[in-house]
Amino acid sequence: MTTPSPPTNSKSARHKTRQPELEADYNRSTALGYEPTNEVGFIRCLEHGYPTPLARWHCHEEYELHMITATSGKAFIGDWIGPFEPGHVVLCGPKLPHNWISLDIPPEGVEHRDLVIQFQHGPIDQACQTIPEFAELLPLLERARHGIEFFGLSESSQSHWHHVKESKGSRRLAAFLESLKLLVRFAKQHR
């Protein structure tokens, strides 16, 4: 049985979906919580509250490890929609649209809600060519293209975020790799 198509002038035919905004370096201001680009390599930390111009349906070229520390609401990650609350940890792959919308915010907003680490694929891929140990990251990063939610990692993920944020140079890279190693172990145990 088929259903007749609505006339082309109907409201449903005119309904348009909103495409995610592609975020780029030019609109990543330190005023929004980003680290200055001259102070970071391929690993960037970000902390922000809610509401903020950063909370919107968007995507970007980098992977994003996203941790929620306050409020609850609805998460939109790729084609998945579900609840979030403090402790929500997700790894989003490049160009995977995402947004977290808080539903329980006080009138004055929340100063700290999100802890984020963004990183590029290229440097990791290049490192895999000469440093075989990096290859253990690739299955995790492949799965992240559709988003991976991690349960029970909030405290350790936040601790790793602060360690990465406070570190510079090779210590920052080592702290970042420790953070990814935690995710790799967890993902292997919870397939």
Where in the sequence are the language-model features?
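Short, Lys/Arg-enriched, Trp-marked, Pro/Gly-tolerant hinge/linker segments that flank
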Residues: I148-G152, H162-R191
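Conserved long hydrophobic alpha-helices within structured protein cores
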Residues: F84-W100, F176-S179
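Short beta-strand-to-loop capping motifs
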Residues: T69, F119-H121, E166
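Residues in well-ordered beta-strands of folded domains
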Residues: L46, H66, I101, Q118, ...
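A hydrophobic/aromatic-rich effector-binding and dimerization subdomain
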Residues: P4-N27, L32-T37, P94-H162
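Short, solvent-exposed loop/helix junctions and linker helices
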Residues: C59, I131, S170-L173
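A structure-centric signal for secondary-structure junctions around beta-strands
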Residues: F42, E62, E111-R113, L173
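Generic protein-terminus/edge-of-domain signal
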Residues: M1-V89
